[in-house]
């Protein structure tokens, strides 16, 4: 059963509230600090303290960082995160969050993503907040993120551009980009920050899933209010037995995905006048923005010119974002689209214990039958480096232990 987390945003969401809630739910503060130190940026401190606010006990997380005068671009932040020795899921999720932030800022200020200079969002404490939340999810083994409707708050707040209405324009742009549900809450404070909105817009599905609950965490915000200023997270394992109808729906969609409103969209465009490194950048952007798959095919175009067909299979609710990336990042004048249906195998992840060390294995299921399994590359590569053995040897060792039930741990 996949590990899932539900963000219960009854008083909004911010980066520090999310950090506190994850620590309260079981993330080791030492492990989290160690993960963040891999960014290679010094000067920050991460503190967490237990507090009682009214009827609730929880954790207040606080990032202390020197005043940061760097106005980083998305390219700067991408390079910082991608160059750090972090798990691939942490890198991909973190970059996806910052990409959404850049796109929201560009829409609000009427500029392009490349011209956006992050101020508050690009400050060191915000980088630690965002990468810290993603690292915390990874340390908890979370595979899927869910969230409740979001109360944005009301009133006014100070920003680098002067006073702005609440919700902040960037917050609204982020929530609108994914069609996030919001509540009619008139609390005269900023309940949801751009950082919090970006985290959920990039990672969450907005519904409460059936789960077998394992832990609950409360993360407090800095402001003290009459009601608890807290974010609650529910950590658990997706449980088919808790909802038979949901189970049937999930199994059907896993095998025959793409019917009705959930049909993915296939986007295609032909390019014959851009260098290969720019095409590679476009495909990377599409994947970071949430494409299900991206591929390129060599083609012959008019006048015998060699070209490339860029194709992206994308969720329907992300179609506009993907089309915008293709139009902005390539020389194309148009993008073809069509709704498609697809068959998708159900999958799960187990951990296999071997003499070389533990490694995760992704298993493939079709109509209740196990039809394939593949070791996770990141785990095998780490073991190969640590043990000084060939990568192929690690793969063979992991696959050889699959049949031994005592070596397998279900997630």
Curated annotation (Swiss-Prot):
**Matching Pfam families, A to Z?**
Ni_insertion (PF01969)
The superkingdom listed in its UniProt entry is: Bacteria
- Which molecular-function annotation in GO is an example for this chain? nickel cation binding
Q: Where is this region: Disordered?
A: 241-266
Q: Where is the composition biased (Basic and acidic residues)?
A: 245-254
- Alphabetized UniProt keyword annotations: Nickel
Question: Which HAMAP family does this entry report, sorted A to Z?
Answer: LarC
Family statement drawn from the similarity comment of this UniProt entry: Belongs to the LarC family.
Name of this protein:
Putative nickel insertion protein
The organism encoding this protein is: Roseiflexus sp. (strain RS-1)
**Lineage, highest ranks first:** Bacteria, Bacillati, Chloroflexota, Chloroflexia, Chloroflexales
């Amino acid at each position: 059963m996949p590990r899932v987390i539900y963000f219960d945003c009854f008083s909004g969401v911010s980066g520090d509230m999310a950090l506190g809630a994850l620590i309260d739910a079981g993330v080791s503060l030492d492990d989290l600090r160690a993960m963040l130190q891999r960014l290679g940026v010094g000067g920050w401190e991460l503190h967490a303290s237990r507090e009682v606010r009214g009827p609730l006990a929880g954790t207040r997380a606080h990032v202390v960082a020197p005043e940061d005068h760097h106005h980083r671009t998305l390219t700067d932040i991408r390079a910082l995160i991608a160059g750090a020795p972090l798990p691939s899921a942490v890198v991909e999720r973190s970059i996806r969050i910052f990409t959404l932030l850049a796109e929201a800022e560009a829409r609000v200020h009427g500029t392009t993503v490349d011209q956006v200079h992050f101020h508050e969002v690009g400050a060191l404490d915000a980088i630690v907040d965002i990468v810290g939340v993603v690292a915390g999810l990874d340390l908890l083994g979370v595979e899927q993120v869910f969230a409740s409707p979001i109360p944005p708050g009301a009133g006014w707040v100070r920003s680098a551009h002067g006073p702005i209405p609440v919700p902040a324009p960037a917050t609204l742009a982020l929530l609108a980009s994914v069609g996030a549900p919001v509540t009619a809450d008139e609390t005269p404070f900023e309940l949801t920050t751009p950082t919090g909105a970006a985290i959920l817009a990039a990672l969450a599905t907005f519904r409460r899933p059936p789960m077998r609950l394992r832990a609950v965490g409360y993360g407090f915000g800095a402001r003290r209010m009459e009601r608890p200023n807290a974010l609650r997270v529910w950590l658990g394992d997706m449980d088919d037995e808790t909802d038979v109808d949901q189970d049937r729906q999930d199994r059907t969609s896993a095998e025959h995905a793409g019917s009705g409103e959930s049909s993915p969209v296939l986007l295609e465009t032909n390019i014959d006048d851009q260098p290969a490194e720019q095409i590679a950048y476009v495909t990377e952007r599409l994947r970071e923005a949430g494409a299900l798959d991206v591929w390129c095919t060599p083609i012959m175009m008019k006048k015998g010119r060699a070209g490339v067909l860029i194709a992206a299979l994308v969720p329907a609710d992300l179609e506009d974002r993907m089309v915008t990336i293709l139009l902005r990042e390539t020389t194309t004048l148009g993008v073809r689209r069509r709704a498609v249906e697809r068959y998708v195998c159900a999958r799960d992840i187990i951990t296999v214990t071997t003499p070389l060390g533990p490694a995760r294995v992704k298993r493939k299921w079709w109509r209740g039958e196990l039809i394939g399994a593949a070791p996770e590359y990141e785990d095998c590569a780490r073991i190969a480096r640590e043990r000084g053995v060939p990568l192929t040897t690690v793969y063979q060792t992991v696959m050889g232990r699959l049949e031994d039930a005592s070596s397998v741990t279900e997630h």
